[in-house]
């Protein structure tokens, strides 16, 4: 049973471990799902940011194309203006040459700006190609990560399904165990009811059998004494039966009588001594009359009665000592030493208590500094070196105590951690206690069931045996009645004693011969009824013991076979659960490794995205700066072109005026 209980406890521990691992795996699955959701959210954010960047790139490319077209138009206008200026240069005078030189300077600046714009445009195209390549790489990498995340999600779903299956099976096992427990409780109740009924019947039969046995034994003791038919001289050697209960009862009665007699003797002695003292003192104190002869005789009788009472007490004490056995007592030296030790301990406690009260009452006076004041002013005397050293030590101790403590965990965080720890430990301990209590209850109920089943079987066997024994006793009593009548008639007629005895012997030898041959293999049989009863009771007790041992053996063998089958089933289940747990642990380790790799890759992808965002922001800023510079330059070029047009128009007007003047001349 102890091995089974240990194995059941091991199975319960493994079940609790599996439940704890299942909870951990559930938490891991939830964490993985939350991490996958967060990764999906981050991916959506990154896609939105990429779309924004692409839109900005498209807008910038469109703006750049517009600027290129504007520059081309300006270049064409510049070429036209240059051609016109060349034509007018051939016709114009020296002031037009100065303007042409200025125009050539502006043209050179414009040509440099155009070259710089082309170079920047080429760099922008290269950067755009690099950005597209990196975007393609990141998109492929993102697709790969999405596929891996889907695989990881599938693995997590598979693990969750398996754990749900295991949980379902464990819940079914728990339900079956509860059903078994309820059935066992019902069977235990039924067995209790049956055993109570059997016990009541057994008590009733025992009372009936005991009453009949008492009656038959009294009849046998009174009517059928031990009588040796062969040698009558042996009848004088009969020894009375030994009764231990009677001796114990006699000892108790003697002890009680001794106590009562001691009390009575002491009371009588006190009464007699005080009465004698009063009788003798009263006349002498009053000095009225002398002691009468009656009082003197009464005091003499009291003295004699006291001597008799003391002798009676001593004799009864010797009787009690002869009956009882004295236990070894402690020596006088040990008792005196113990009393001295107790007295010294009491004196020590009292003296220490007095010292404590003394110091507590005079603490203020002892701590105050002693001084003297000869002329009104308090003068403090010099203190001893030992007092100064003790003060220094006290100051050092106070300084060491007042040192700042090291930083610790904040109080709120510590309370939260303690609450979490206590809740987790309480839940775990509560579950463990529930499991242990249920196991103990199951084992206790099984033991009670087995016990009551065995008791019921034994009670049935006892009932059968007692019924058979009652029948045998009734038959024997019926047989013994005519024998007692024959003995009585033989006692009345002394002449026919030998003939009656011979007839009784023949009848007694003939009647018990058949059951003796059937039950006992012994060749010699007792002719008396007492011998037959004793032999039958011994055979019945041995048969009862054999049947009881056989029943117990068969019951325990069947129970051991059942428990071995249950143990084999539990071992197979435990092996299966252990294999599943190992597989789940391996998959969990693989999932954790894949999660770590995915986390690292996600970190790298985030780093690349942040780097690209930084590069994009820098390129965007540079392009914005360049566009602002180009816009400023175009504004300045427009202003110069407008000024040049104005100068060209003025030159044209002046040229026309000069031509008209020349024509008029």
Curated annotation (Swiss-Prot):
The keyword Coiled coil applies. Pfam families: KLRAQ (PF10205), PPP1R21_C (PF21636), PPP1R21_helical (PF10212). GO terms for cellular component: early endosome. Component of the FERRY complex (Five-subunit Endosomal Rab5 and RNA/ribosome intermediary). The FERRY complex directly interacts with mRNAs and RAB5A, and functions as a RAB5A effector involved in the localization and the distribution of specific mRNAs most likely by mediating their endosomal transport. The complex recruits mRNAs and ribosomes to early endosomes through direct mRNA-interaction. Putative regulator of protein phosphatase 1 (PP1) activity. May play a role in the endosomal sorting process or in endosome maturation pathway. Component of the FERRY complex. Coiled-coil domains of PPP1R21 are essential for RNA binding. This is Protein phosphatase 1 regulatory subunit 21.
């Amino acid at each position: 049973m102890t091995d089974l209980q240990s194995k059941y406890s091991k199975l319960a521990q493994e079940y609790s471990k599996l439940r704890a691992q299942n909870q951990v795996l559930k938490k891991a699955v939830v964490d993985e799902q939350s991490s996958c959701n967060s990764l999906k959210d981050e991916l959506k954010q990154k896609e939105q940011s990429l779309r924004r960047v692409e839109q900005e790139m498209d807008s910038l490319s469109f703006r750049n194309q517009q600027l290129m077209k504007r520059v081309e138009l300006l270049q064409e206008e510049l070429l036209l203006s240059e051609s016109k200026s060349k034509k007018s240069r051939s016709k114009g005078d020296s002031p037009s040459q100065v303007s042409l030189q200025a125009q050539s300077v502006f043209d050179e600046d414009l040509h440099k700006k155009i070259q710089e714009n082309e170079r920047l445009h080429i760099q922008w195209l290269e950067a755009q190609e690099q950005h597209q390549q990196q975007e393609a790489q990141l998109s492929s990498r993102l697709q790969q990560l999405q596929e891996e995340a889907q695989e990881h999600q599938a693995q997590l779903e598979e693990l969750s399904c398996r754990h749900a299956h295991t949980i379902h099976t464990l819940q079914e096992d728990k339900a079956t165990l509860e059903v078994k427990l309820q059935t066992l409780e019902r069977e235990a109740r039924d067995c209790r009811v049956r055993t109570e009924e059997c016990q009541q019947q057994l008590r009733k039969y025992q009372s009936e059998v005991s009453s009949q046995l008492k009656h038959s034994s009294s009849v046998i003791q009174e009517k059928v004494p031990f009588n040796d038919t062969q040698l009558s001289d042996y009848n004088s050697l009969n020894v009375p039966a030994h009764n231990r209960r009677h001796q114990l009862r006699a000892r108790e009665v003697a002890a009680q009588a001794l106590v009562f007699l001691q009390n009575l003797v002491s009371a009588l002695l006190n009464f007699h001594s005080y009465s004698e003292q009063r009788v003798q003192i009263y006349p002498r104190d009053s000095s009225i009359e002398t002691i009468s002869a009656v009082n003197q005789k009464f005091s003499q009788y009291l003295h004699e009665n006291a001597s008799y009472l003391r002798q009676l007490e001593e004799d009864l004490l010797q009787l009690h000592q002869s009956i009882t056995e004295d236990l070894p007592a402690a020596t006088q030296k040990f008792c005196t030493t113990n009393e001295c030790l107790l007295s010294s301990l009491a004196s020590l406690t009292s003296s220490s208590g007095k010292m404590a009260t003394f110091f507590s009452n005079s603490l203020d006076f002892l701590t105050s500094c002693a001084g003297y004041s000869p002329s009104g002013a308090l003068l403090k005397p010099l203190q001893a070196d030992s007092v100064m050293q003790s003060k220094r030590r006290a100051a050092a101790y106070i300084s060491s105590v007042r040192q700042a403590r090291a930083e610790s965990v904040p109080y709120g965080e510590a309370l939260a951690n303690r609450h979490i720890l206590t809740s987790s430990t309480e839940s775990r301990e509560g579950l463990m206690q529930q499991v242990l209590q249920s196991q103990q209850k199951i084992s206790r109920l099984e033991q009670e069931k087995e016990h009551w089943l065995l008791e019921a079987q034994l009670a049935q066997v006892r009932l059968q045996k007692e019924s058979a024994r009652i029948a045998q006793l009734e038959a024997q009593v019926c047989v013994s009645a005519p024998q007692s009548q024959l003995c009585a008639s033989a006692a009345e007629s002394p002449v026919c004693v030998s003939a009656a005895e011979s007839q009784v012997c023949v009848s007694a030898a003939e009647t018990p011969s058949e059951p003796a041959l059937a039950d006992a293999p012994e060749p010699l049989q007792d002719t008396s009824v007492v011998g037959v009863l004793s032999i039958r009771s011994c055979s019945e007790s041995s048969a009862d013991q054999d049947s009881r041992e056989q029943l117990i053996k068969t019951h325990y063998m069947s129970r051991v076979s059942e428990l071995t089958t249950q143990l084999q089933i539990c071992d197979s289940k435990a092996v299966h659960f252990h294999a599943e747990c190992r597989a789940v642990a391996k998959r969990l380790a693989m999932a954790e490794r894949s999660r770590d790799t995915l986390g690292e890759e996600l970190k790298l992808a985030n780093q690349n995205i942040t780097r690209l965002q930084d590069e994009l922001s820098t390129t965007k800023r540079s392009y914005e700066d360049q566009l602002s510079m180009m816009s400023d330059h175009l504004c300045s070029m427009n202003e110069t072109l407008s000024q040049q047009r104005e100068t060209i128009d003025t030159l044209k007007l002046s040229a026309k005026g000069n031509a008209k003047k020349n024509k008029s001349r």
